[in-house]
């Protein structure tokens, strides 16, 4: 599914003393099968943008098109799964099974939820028999995150949105979470990430969009992002290119991904 965000603006508490402009004339395209990072400081409008994309809130103005068409919230949510920053915010059930099965029962009430729940739990690395009867609220941070993701991919959507998925995870937990992202990408499906931990996620994304005070200030490849926002990367890139030339290799014939890998491994 290709998503087009066209001149989207959003104002919270419009017409009241608490009025706040969260987004201002934001336009972007999210291509099918790509992994997009949405970056920016706290309050820049990242979460608001993705909630609009996921059909959870209506923009004040502008359009969001899905494969060129406007769709209602319910239709959108069948094709998009969004996991929030804090898994507890989306938990409601007393058993992991019921938590994960909710979307199946909601969108496809005639289907047997058991095989789909088992598939989703195994996809995120949770053993079905060991976890299906456990209480979601009493799991570890990493386990809660996995349950939250399983519950939004169980109905097999085209797009997975993860809002700050690395928060509260140790190094091993972050690695495990990013493995889930990579597995989702191998299915040819779209991933949209919000993360402040750019250094950890940058090698897993194709493109970066940066928001600042509700406006889009950057939209480009991860290579372009690093060159613009990380002066250390530019210096490292020049050194690596010089070494390649001295070794008789041509850095200018390499793709951005090949050169980026050389720089990151230098």
Swiss-Prot record:
Identify the EC number(s): 7.-.-.-
The question of whether Ubl conjugation is a record keyword is answered with: no
Q: Name the top EC class.
A: translocase
Q: How does this chain sit within the bilayer?
A: Peripheral membrane protein
Q: Which residues bind ATP?
A: 43-48
Q: What CDD domains does UniProt report for this protein, alphabetically? A: ABC_cobalt_CbiO_domain1
Question: Which residue intervals define the domain ABC transporter in the entry?
Answer: 3-238
Q: Name one GO cellular component term.
A: plasma membrane
Instruction: Give GO BP annotations, semicolon-separated.
Output: riboflavin transport
* Taxonomic superkingdom: Bacteria
Residue segments, region Required for heterodimer formation: 220-266
Q: Where in the cell is it found?
A: Cell inner membrane
Query: Which UniProt keywords are given for this protein, alphabetically ordered?
Result: ATP-binding, Cell inner membrane, Cell membrane, Membrane, Nucleotide-binding, Translocase, Transport
| Residues at the active site | 164
Q: Recite the other comments.
A: Structure 4HLU is probably in the open state.
Q: What does this protein do?
A: ATP-binding (A) component of a common energy-coupling factor (ECF) ABC-transporter complex. Unlike classic ABC transporters this ECF transporter provides the energy necessary to transport a number of different substrates. Expression of the complex plus RibU in E.coli allows riboflavin uptake; uptake does not occur in the absence of RibU or the EcfA1A2T complex.
The family annotation for this protein states: Belongs to the ABC transporter superfamily. Energy-coupling factor EcfA family.
Summary of subunit composition and partner proteins: Forms a heterodimer with EcfA1. Forms a stable energy-coupling factor (ECF) transporter complex composed of 2 membrane-embedded substrate-binding proteins (S component, RibU, BioY), 2 ATP-binding proteins (A component) and 2 transmembrane proteins (T component) upon coexpression in E.coli. Stable subcomplexes with both A plus T components can also be isolated. This complex interacts with at least 2 substrate-specific components, BioY and RibU.
Protein name per the record = Energy-coupling factor transporter ATP-binding protein EcfA2
Q: Which gene encodes it?
A: ecfA2
